[in-house]
Amino acid sequence: MKTKTAAILIVTLFALIGCAKQKTSAPKVDLHTAAIMGDLEAVQQHIRAGSDLNIKEPTRGSTPLLTAVVFGNTDVALALIDAGANINHQNTEGSTPLITAAFLCRAEIVKALLAKGADKTLRNNAGHTALQSVSRPFEDVKSIYESLATALEPLGLKLDYERIRTTRPVIAEMLR
């Protein structure tokens, strides 16, 4: 009886170990689409499947982390940061997740990026650091926000200009 019980336990143990080693397959939705849509479950599946978290989209060379930051999908951005996505990647415009999160006043993402050691000294193609992206008066840069919102509204981007206006000084202080 003891031998039979031991054999069952060993077989069960091997079965559990084998299941634990099975690789999760990536979902059908690509990682950038999941980042745009805020589909945290799909992003987590990609992470478990070992998908390339730094895959660049062809238009501007943004990574899923940068995409999540733009669209304000904080949970997705935090999951990608925690999973080891490149926090200092620069797209074709030189923007990084930190510069973008700062400019769009995504405070929780800025905090997470800084905690992981994001480089505050990197500059975009206009020569601006994350701090400089929030240093000018809001009225001087409101048209940039409006252009961004117009371009990305069809994909679901909504910008709260009042929140951005009032949060810019807070973000600037975080970056000092």
Question: Which residues does each PLM region occupy?
Answer:
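Start-of-repeat signature of ankyrin repeats
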Residues: 27, 60-61, 94, 127
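Ankyrin-repeat-protein effector appendages
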Residues: 19-30, 132-176
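Ankyrin-repeat helical core positions
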Residues: 35, 47-48, 69, 81-82, ...
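Ankyrin repeat A-helix N-terminal signature
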Residues: 33-38, 67-73, 100-106, 133-141, ...
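Bacterial N-terminal signal peptides
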Residues: 8-16
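Ankyrin repeat structural motif
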Residues: 39-47, 73-81, 106-114, 140-148, ...
